[in-house]
């Protein structure tokens, strides 16, 4: 006998499902998982394209069998390295799956799940960086020794025989589990008919009510009776002639003389369980829509073994398992696995989405399993400043998977910018220079199309810089306020101290996460601003201005060129930006979010938090390559976050901002800094007088 081996046929969505399962659930666990295989009878397929084992996109998660399909019981072992894929003991895998079939035959569990006769195993490795999937299917077939041979020419069913058989099989299937559908018993129950061999009249299972028979059944002279294979042992074929008893299987093979691969295991059941050395096999190849075509074929098979004694203990469960084969050959006919490169089929944007997330999700495999990546991904970030700090911060946010980034800047790209600001190039400087905010947003989308990036050309009102166009300034203030309200985190990355004042006020008033970075020549400060805590105001962390004794003012007036420009060591912006984003992500991972207390390094370990400590400020000194972690409380006379400033902003909005910008001492008087300054001066005067009187 020749048999048609299965050919694996994997739907593309399955690879995505496998990748998702590996990244998000299995991680380093390479235990074998259940896999639903499906095969079907397709009369229109060429013989060489038939007998396909289909793996649908939901094969890992669903257990239902679609109408018209037959079930196969599969397992997939997705290993962690390509070396393990190549070096694993494949023979042991095959034998393990074959033994499962052998044991099920011997202990009768095959009767509750005949689809085990169509078991398979898949060895795979998913290269999730390159989206290349290496895999190798094995369809275990237990050898029959000696082999079975055909002792008569294959006999196709007639159209009428096929039609009535299909109806009987369909009726039987409605009452049994899908695991039974692929294998069944069929028996001809004759009415009073003439035997086709000698013309004598035989009474076989006489049907009392001849009127209930269909016209085709009356013409044939018999009816089909269908039952599960377990009924062989309860006498389903009792008193029936051998030529009227058929062991049937759904055969997806379209070769006329080569039945499907599963027949090999079915014949092991016939010999090992039923002790038969001669059997009529029915290759069931008909479908409901074409049931009169008569494609099903009857085979008479015989094993050239000696008479099988049912009492021979060697034929029981103690009999050694026969040889097992079944590894699939590739398209070239070689005994080796296959490789699918999914990048050839995937939408480049979708591929980028999954690749961006890959490295982040790998962190959860071993290093930080409690990392909340969705929280990071869904945080909307507003970057005030699209220059050196803004460019580096944006790139680091992309690396962490942030999808919404908005720039605010009123500057243009100059020729000195591209070498220090990685979102810009030489062409952006031409024609007077592109607007930084707009070009930075466009550059992010060029880097990663999945990001939602936008830019706004706005000027931020600053104390010490009187307003010249009140209507324009008010519109820009309202636009900035709207952006602050729409975002979850504000990154203050502007050039001057006074430019940071209004964003600090807005962020504190709205309870947003405010992240701040500022640079010196070889120093930097990276910090998070505190948020309002009504229940424990004494625990509030300070903002960028909480250590000041004067309100911000025009810091570039009367300054020389080297004082007006941000003159820093070129690498310091990248260092500060990276620390700022890492601090931001640590804040998001803390249960208290922006209200997280300042960590004390010596008292906390990494195990207390998915990413380690959550400091308030990091002050860096590049001259000796050191960092100092600092914590500061909120100051009740702060020019940006004190109670008086918050109340004035919340109650008066633009009118407050306009006065703060235009009136020189307004902020100091409102916050209480003016009074503090006068008090200090009085103390100095008193101290001086006391010193002189003592002398």
UniProtKB/Swiss-Prot annotation:
User: Subcellular location, in the record's words?
Assistant: Cytoplasm; Preautophagosomal structure
**What is an annotated GO biological process for this record, any one?**
autophagosome assembly
Q: Is Protein transport a UniProt keyword of this protein?
A: yes
Q: Which Gene3D superfamilies match?
A: NAD(P)-binding Rossmann-like Domain, Ubiquitin-like modifier-activating enzyme ATG7 C-terminal domain, Ubiquitin-like modifier-activating enzyme ATG7 N-terminal domain
Keyword list, A-Z: Autophagy, Cytoplasm, Protein transport, Transport, Ubl conjugation pathway
MF terms (GO), sorted A to Z: Atg12 activating enzyme activity; Atg8 activating enzyme activity
Quick check: keyword Secreted in the entry?
A: no
Active site: residue positions: 565
Q: Which InterPro entries match?
A: Atg7, Atg7_N, Atg7_N_1, Atg7_N_2, ThiF/MoeB/HesA, ThiF_NAD_FAD-bd, Ubiquitin-activating_enz
Q: Name one GO cellular component term.
A: phagophore assembly site
Mark the transmembrane ranges.
none
Please indicate the residue ranges that the annotation assigns to the motif GXGXXG motif.
Answer: 385-390
Q: How does it assemble?
A: Homodimer.
Primary role: E1-like activating enzyme involved in the 2 ubiquitin-like systems required for cytoplasm to vacuole transport (Cvt) and autophagy. Activates ATG12 for its conjugation with ATG5 and ATG8 for its conjugation with phosphatidylethanolamine. Both systems are needed for the ATG8 association to Cvt vesicles and autophagosomes membranes. Autophagy is essential for maintenance of amino acid levels and protein synthesis under nitrogen starvation.
Q: In the UniProt entry, what is the domain comment? A: The GxGxxG motif is important for the function, possibly through binding with ATP.
The similarity annotation says: Belongs to the ATG7 family.
In its UniProt entry, what is this protein called?
A: Ubiquitin-like modifier-activating enzyme ATG7
């Amino acid at each position: 006998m020749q048999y048609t081996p299965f050919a694996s046929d994997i739907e593309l969505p399955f690879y995505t499902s496998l990748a998702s399962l590996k990244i998000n659930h299995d991680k380093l666990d390479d235990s074998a998982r259940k896999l639903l295989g499906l095969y079907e009878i397709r009369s229109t397929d060429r013989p060489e394209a038939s007998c396909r084992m289909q793996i649908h996109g939901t094969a890992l998660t669903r257990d239902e069998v679609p109408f018209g399909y037959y079930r196969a019981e599969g397992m997939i072992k997705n290993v962690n390295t390509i070396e393990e894929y190549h070096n694993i003991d494949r023979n042991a895998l095959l034998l393990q799956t074959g033994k499962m079939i052998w044991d099920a035959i011997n202990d009768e569990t095959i009767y509750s799940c005949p689809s085990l006769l169509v078991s398979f195993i898949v060895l795979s490795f998913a290269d999730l960086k390159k989206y290349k999937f290496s895999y190798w299917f094995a369809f275990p077939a237990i050898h029959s020794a000696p082999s079975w041979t055909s002792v008569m020419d294959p006999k196709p069913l007639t159209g009428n025989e096929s039609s009535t058989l299909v109806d009987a099989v369909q009726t039987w299937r409605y009452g049994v589990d899908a695991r039974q559908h692929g294998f069944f018993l069929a028996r001809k129950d004759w009415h009073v008919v003439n035997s086709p061999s000698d013309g004598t009249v035989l009474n076989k299972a006489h049907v009392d009510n001849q009127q209930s028979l269909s016209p085709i059944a009356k013409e044939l002279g018999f009816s089909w009776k269908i039952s599960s294979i377990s009924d062989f042992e309860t006498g389903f074929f009792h008193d029936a002639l051998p030529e009227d008893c058929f062991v049937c299987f759904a055969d997806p093979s379209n070769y006329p003389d080569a039945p499907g691969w599963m027949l090999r295991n079915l014949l092991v059941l016939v010999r090992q369980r039923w002790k038969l050395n001669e059997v009529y096999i029915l290759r069931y190849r008909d479908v409901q829509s074409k049931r009169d075509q008569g494609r099903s074929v009857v085979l008479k098979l015989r094993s050239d073994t000696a008479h099988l004694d049912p009492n021979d203990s060697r034929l029981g469960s103690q009999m050694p398992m026969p040889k097992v084969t079944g590894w699939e050959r590739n398209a070239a006919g070689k005994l080796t696995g296959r490789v699918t490169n999914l990048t050839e089929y995937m939408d480049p944007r979708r591929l980028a989405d999954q690749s961006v997330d890959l490295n982040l999700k790998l962190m959860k495999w071993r290093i930080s399993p409690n990392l909340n990546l969705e929280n990071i991904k869904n945080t909307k970030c507003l970057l005030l400043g699209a220059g050196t700090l803004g460019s580096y911060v944006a790139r680091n946010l992309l690396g962490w998977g942030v999808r919404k980034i908005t720039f605010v800047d009123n500057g243009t790209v100059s020729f000195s910018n591209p070498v220090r600001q990685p979102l810009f190039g030489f062409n952006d400087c031409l024609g007077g220079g592109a607007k930084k905010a707009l070009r930075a947003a466009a550059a992010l989308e060029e880097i990663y199309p999945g990001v939602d990036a936008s830019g706004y050309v706005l000027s931020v009102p600053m104390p010490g810089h009187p307003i010249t166009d009140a209507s324009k300034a008010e519109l820009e203030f309202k636009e900035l306020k709207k952006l602050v309200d729409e975002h979850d985190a504000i990154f203050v990355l502007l050039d001057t101290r006074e430019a940071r004042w209004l964003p600090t006020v807005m962020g504190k008033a709205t309870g947003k996460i405010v992240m701040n970075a500022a640079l010196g020549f070889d120093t930097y400060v990276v910090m998070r601003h505190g948020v309002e805590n009504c229940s424990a105001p004494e625990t509030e962390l300070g903002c960028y201005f909480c250590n000041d004794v004067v309100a911000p003012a025009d810091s570039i007036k009367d300054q020389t060129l080297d004082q007006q420009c941000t003159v820093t060591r070129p690498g310091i912006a990248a260092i500060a930006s990276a620390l700022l984003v890492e601090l931001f992500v640590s804040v998001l991972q803390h249960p208290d979010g922006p209200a997280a207390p300042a960590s004390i390094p010596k008292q906390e370990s990494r195990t207390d938090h998915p990413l380690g400590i959550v400091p308030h400020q990091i002050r860096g000194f590049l001259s000796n390559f050191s960092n100092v972690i600092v914590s500061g409380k909120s100051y009740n006379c702060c020019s940006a976050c004190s109670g008086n400033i918050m109340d004035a902003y919340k109650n008066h909005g633009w009118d407050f901002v306009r006065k703060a910008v235009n009136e020189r001492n307004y902020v100091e008087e409102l916050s209480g800094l003016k009074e503090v300054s006068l008090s200090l001066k009085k103390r100095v005067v008193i101290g001086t007088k006391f010193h002189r009187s003592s002398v």
